[in-house]
């Protein structure tokens, strides 16, 4: 199970769905623009 768009996440343990990124600056699942 993965985290969907704009779900809160942990940068060091990225469980976002494919193509989403999780960064320390923006700790939620989103597209890497």
Swiss-Prot record:
The main location is secreted
Q: Which domain of life is it from?
A: Eukaryota
Record-annotated disulphide pairs: 2-17, 9-22, 16-29
Q: Name one Pfam family in it.
A: Toxin_12
Q: Which GO terms describe its molecular function?
A: ion channel inhibitor activity; sodium channel regulator activity; toxin activity
Q: Which GO terms describe its cellular component?
A: extracellular region
Where does it localize? Answer: Secreted
Keyword field: Disulfide bond, Ion channel impairing toxin, Knottin, Neurotoxin, Secreted, Toxin, Voltage-gated sodium channel impairing toxin
Q: In which tissues is it expressed?
A: Expressed by the venom gland.
Domain-level remarks: The presence of a 'disulfide through disulfide knot' structurally defines this protein as a knottin.
Q: What is the documented function of this protein?
A: Voltage-gated sodium channel Nav1.7/SCN9A inhibitor.
Q: State the similarity comment.
A: Belongs to the neurotoxin 10 (Hwtx-1) family. 22 (Htx-4) subfamily.
Q: What is this protein called?
A: Mu-theraphotoxin-Osp1b
Which species does this protein come from?
Orphnaecus sp. (strain Maanghit-Cave/Philippines)
């Amino acid at each position: 199970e993965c985290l969907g768009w704009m779900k809160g996440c942990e940068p060091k343990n990225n469980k976002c769905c494919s193509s989403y990124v999780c960064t320390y600056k923006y700790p939620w699942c989103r597209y890497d623009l």
